[in-house]
């Protein structure tokens, strides 16, 4: 898995961080560790070798810039070279809100295309636009039903032919006509291989009918280096492929290989799938990606994620916190927000110093604890939530019984509440920079000691 790659790279760099003296021998030892970590993640050996030579040359020959120590300079060199390996400059999906846009998703069967269609619709929906889905895959059993379930989950219109009596081209034509009120049409096409001439011809027809703003190739991250051949085959067949979406990176030991292989053919990776949920789609930024991989965090993405999941009740609770009020009501609202943000391990990876260092078991334990805390608070009266100091022996017994937990767990919750309240105690309106909104104020206050 990618967190294993992150752990191995972090351990290699720790040898530099913890060293009393950095010499040529240590640099070579660290480079060897980096090589091993990348090759285990299925990154092309030639790419790894060329990158290693560049790291060694710069680490030995270059003098650190003013204000940088030798250690910091070497870590920066490694960071820069890893970013280069993945394509350097991020490229975003550009959509004009004033015009109707069409996105065509193509890829091999089993790459995760249908799920990615729904994820992309959800991503666009969160940007304030009105997406709609067209199910044009009539060949895979249950493809329409799968997309229908996902579209209902995110409340996005869907057009398709459950009877499979129409051709994909007919479905797309009719779908465009029926979904006129939508800003962005996302078309889920049938999975295909480069040798399937009829399917490639079908895709070309769809392209002519829809005149898509972007054709996105969906690639399975578990393919590792083989992703390069697949991406190249599609790029040769359909020269207008605008970008790549790499899926299944959360559970692949070959994710690094897939990303570097695709980057090698100069096909821009715009999105990566980081989990099974409809919200587990991220724009791909090589700098942020490597930063998180090395445990340096990614606060900008974390703040964006918190803003995405905030609703009216969260806003109200944040207003209360910023005014100095913090009860179990506010705590509950914050736990709700954290739960919506995604897997705990992914969230912790965005916080500097954590990266891939949070054990899977610890992340699962934390997620379970958050759920249990919410169940315990559901067993409390509003009076108890607003005045936690009222919770003494008899109330403790009643709450524990109602939640189906031990009294010690209620005490653990109250202790967590007291600690959190203390952390929020120093918050004063206007004290923190406004970047990231109200939630940004709170998160920055908690992450940095002043």
Curated annotation (Swiss-Prot):
It holds the Pfam family SRP_SPB. Gene3D superfamilies: P-loop containing nucleotide triphosphate hydrolases, Signal recognition particle SRP54, nucleotide-binding domain, Signal recognition particle, SRP54 subunit, M-domain. It comes from the Archaea. It is found in: Cytoplasm. GO terms for cellular component: signal recognition particle. HAMAP family: SRP54. Involved in targeting and insertion of nascent membrane proteins into the cytoplasmic membrane. Binds to the hydrophobic signal sequence of the ribosome-nascent chain (RNC) as it emerges from the ribosomes. The SRP-RNC complex is then targeted to the cytoplasmic membrane where it interacts with the SRP receptor FtsY. Composed of three domains: the N-terminal N domain, which is responsible for interactions with the ribosome, the central G domain, which binds GTP, and the C-terminal M domain, which binds the RNA and the signal sequence of the RNC. This is Signal recognition particle 54 kDa protein. It comes from Methanococcus vannielii (strain ATCC 35089 / DSM 1224 / JCM 13029 / OCM 148 / SB). The lineage of its organism: Archaea, Methanobacteriati, Methanobacteriota, Methanomada group, Methanococci.
